[in-house]
Curated annotation (Swiss-Prot):
Pfam families: Phe_tRNA-synt_N (PF02912), tRNA-synt_2d (PF01409). This is Phenylalanine--tRNA ligase alpha subunit. It comes from Bartonella bacilliformis (strain ATCC 35685 / KC583 / Herrer 020/F12,63). The gene is pheS. Binds 2 magnesium ions per tetramer. The keyword Membrane does not apply.
Amino acid sequence: MSDIERLEQEIFLALEAACDEQELEAVRVAALGKKGSISERLKALGNISADERLKVGPALNELKKRILELLAQKRDIFKRQATALRLSKERVDVTLPVRSSPVERGRIHPISQVIDELIAIYADMGFSIAEGPDIETDYYNFTALNFPEGHPAREMHDTFFFSEDATGNRKVLRTHTSPVQIRVMEKKQAPIRIIIPGKTYRMDSDATHSPMFHQVEGLVIDKTSNIAHMMWLHETFCKAFFEVPSVKMRFRPSFFPFTEPSMEVDIQCDRSGSEVKFGEGHDWLEILGCGMVHPQVLKNVGFDPDEYQGFAWGMGIDRIAMLKYGMPDLRAFFDADLRWLDHYGFRCFDISTLFSRLGNV
């Protein structure tokens, strides 16, 4: 056994026998300190022949490297052991005592509640949920939906545009959830039955409008769906959502670039008192816009308008939440006021279903 091998064995046995940081440091100093066994041998390399130096030097450096690695491993073990010991001795119970009568404090935001109600109603009628990006291209937000160049919706004062990219194109914050209709029709074959709840953005702000608001749109595409089906769908939805046995509706001619014919739908109500009552009275409130999908929109996504048809509609989630639950100012929805949420919010464990009151408060 050479001198270096014997030295290696001694040092490694000492390292293995070290029981704490103090003993480990003593081994380090004895081996690698200023007057340590390895340090002294490295200093003495100049006193031996060149041939021996070529053998002994690398061997000593390799031994020094292995010792440092083992030292680091042992230190890590000691640190983890010390931490575990300290935690076992210094354990603190950070939990609060349970209230004698637990009180529900959290509340579901009215927007989240209404979205759940919408999903429950439309899912019961066979619709699935679709989603898409908030940041859209001009094509999906306008062109594919039959918005011509120069349409007012393309103006800067109505739409949030991003800066132009290297190709001169600008993306937008979507002004409606209609782009998702295009994306779904590009990927799926008929029949299609979807609703698309989500955030939309327009330059508008007052008591009944917000620059960011929530909208739900729906789309039905097949070979036979017609206006009669669309009218039945809206009537069924309004009865379920506003929780009334019957409701009168009127369909007024309107214009949307992506539907033809287009209509706006009003619902019968009574606004004579402090709150709006649906299914009775002599007043009318606009509730949504709808129409048969424009043939050009079908062509844009590869559907043959001579074979396929369908209808689409959209309504403001914030608006119908205000109408149903009597909230006067849309801006309060987004003020993060816990007092407002405590008043208008919903209990966390109330689940929207068609077998109980949807808006159980």
